A protein has these predicted regions:
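Conserved redox-active cysteine motifs that mediate thiol-disulfide chemistry
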Residues: 28-45
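Solvent-exposed loop/turn segments at secondary-structure junctions
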Residues: 30-34, 63-66, 88, 122
């Protein structure tokens, strides 16, 4: 189980089981990953639009430097759940989801824990959320 920037453990299971969440995006990223940072404006827009409709993001950082990870989250205004165990690709979550490269993401339906979509980049995430949650 990875920790947030305050050092508190936050499990994906607890986020998926939270009754206010209908869909959770499990997002793997790192501050040093250029393509990951390109996704941030899309994630921010979709989070703002759909969070109150039951959408949550559980972001797992592959950073190994705590300060760089936290500073990037603050600078980019990534105000959703952020966790890291600061071990890079060696995190158990990466192994569980067979993540070989980033960015990588999985959209999980919380009612049954099923992955309903993967690799939703750019406008694709917003389009999928609109389909699932409405405008």
């Amino acid at each position: 189980m990875a920790k947030n920037s305050d050092g508190k453990e936050v499990s994906l299971k607890s986020v998926v089981e939270n009754k206010k969440n209908t869909y959770v995006l499990l997002d793997f990223w790192a501050s040093w990953c250029g393509p990951c940072m390109v996704e941030v404006p899309f994630l921010k827009a979709d989070y703002e639009k759909y969070n109150k409709k039951g959408f949550e993001i559980y972001a797992v950082s592959f950073d190994s430097q705590r300060e760089r990870w936290i500073e990037t989250v603050k600078q980019q205004g990534m105000n959703w759940i952020q966790v890291s165990d600061l071990t890079g690709f060696q995190t158990p979550a990466a192994e569980a989801y067979a993540v070989q490269s980033i960015p990588a993401n999985f959209l999980i339906r919380t009612s049954d824990g099923q992955i309903v979509a993967t690799q939703l980049r750019g406008e694709a995430l917003g389009e999928k959320l609109e389909e699932l949650l409405g405008k």
